[in-house]
Amino acid sequence: MKHGCLILSCASMQLALPLESILEVSRMVAPCAKLLRVPRYVLGVVDFHGQLVPLIDLPARLGLCPPRSPEALIAGHIAFIELPSGLWGMAVDGVHDLINEQMEPLTIEPRHLVGLVLGSLRVSATERALVLNPGRLLSVVARARIGAELSELAKPPERAGGPA
């Protein structure tokens, strides 16, 4: 079992994801397809070892910045995470460090992140990173919409015309 957290930069904040949910981290790549009827923070899908995985602009999803284009994130990274609902790619502005410190509970959760935070970690003498709850990053409705669009994308194209 993996322990600790990966420190990420999301817009101007330092956040963390628990290592047990992270499969791999890679440099940002352009999506290979767009999804249509999904929230604006969904950038499209990327190929992860032969599987199409939805790519989420994590800072935009958290309300830390407006939705961005893949080009605006070209210097960023993708944290591929595995949840009970499947594989997801989380586009972030930067990846900094692995920390194996004790997580501390929050006394007050930031209003825009209520229910999304597990606790906080000390990153330095003056900085803390909020530890996100990966299972709560996407709502049930958003997961359903994204799943429906992925299913549409996976369908074979219909042939024009009828039987000959």
Language-model features and meaning:
Residues M1-A164:
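An acidic, low-aromatic, low-complexity terminal/linker signal
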